[in-house]
Amino acid sequence: MIESTNFRAGIGGSFLRATPAALSQMPQRLYAPSRNTSISAPMHSQSLPRIVEKNRHEWLVQTRLFDLESIVDVEPQVNPRQWLLSGNPRLASLITQTIGDRWITHLEDLQQLVPMADHPLFQLRWRAVKQANKQVLANEIYQSQGIRINVNSLIDLQLQPIVGHQRQLLNILHIITLFNQIKQNPGLNILPRTFIFGDIATEHGAGLRSDCHEGHEYDHEQQETDSNSATLALIKSLAKIFAADPDVSGKLQVVYVPESAGLTNQMYAAADLTQQIATAAMEDIDLSQLRATINGVVSIGSLGKTNYWLQQIVGEQNCFRFGLAIPEIALFKEYGYDPYNYYKYYPQIRQAIDYLLAGYFTPDDPSVCRSIIDTLLGTDEQMVLADYIFYAACQHHVSDSYRQASSWTQMSIMNVAGVK
């Protein structure tokens, strides 16, 4: 176990330095830390107002994130029709066979899928398309990397640039927790998962931003750069370690697919779950995330602007949400946040970090993960440890839900039906 004096940075023995009275007096400005929100799709003038125009005031009060007057238009590369027609032709064909081809020019026609969402025969055909897409992806990965993926597993996709605020580390800590559970109990009936990481550029240049470097010294920026590089190295090492471990074979798999592999369409077509887990306070609205939605990929997401927007589209019962919202993150940072306490008091977090500290997953160079540990237990600006327990619980719910094939398929169909 790590000694607290190495990482505590002088903050007292609570997760948050604030009294109940102080919390009750939290200034309203914490509810709107970003006043300049990017809507990155030409459809914004149609889709977003449709969500809020009936009761705009109520929606803004609920989100406390932004108002329509503060939205800045930017030219995106968001084309849901093309993502489905060229990226997932099997699913596009099934949809056309079911509701006709008018949806190609009128996306709102996808709503005609709603009454079909719980139809057993249609669900069976939907799952057959997904399974065929999984096999295509598996073949491509095997040909390019020599890796065989389990096509009967839940394919869990995180396809974003590997940078701090996208929080691949949150995903990794949970993967290590699952690994530890299997090692502690090799007979554990765990849902098989294939975790696919891809380091790709966003669909548009302005959709995501990171404010975390402003006003910080170079050494802090260098620490984050080192941590990002170490995260990529750790992902690749996890893939090798898991592949060689008979205890996790067929249960857990990690795959890294570089952008150069050209498999973006295949990954979205095959995925069951997409991880949109960026730090809530660090993201602008990014409508390129509709690429997963229109492929019927269910999302697990943090409580940021994009994920709230998508939740309104697909319905809260058809996605998974967790963690701290923007005002809560702002509150933590204003009143003091000590990540070490999460390491100290939560065994799952401590066990996962101790694996990293021991160099278990990086045997060739145990020091690789040092910058990751420094980042997590030093300042943890991306609130990875603060969100971890919420995230792990939500992922457990994902596993339980995926075992119910009919209800999961219905969620997938409703995701597509919500795009308009």
What are these model-derived regions, one by one?
Residues 1-420:
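Catalytic cores of carbohydrate-active enzymes across secretory and cytosolic contexts
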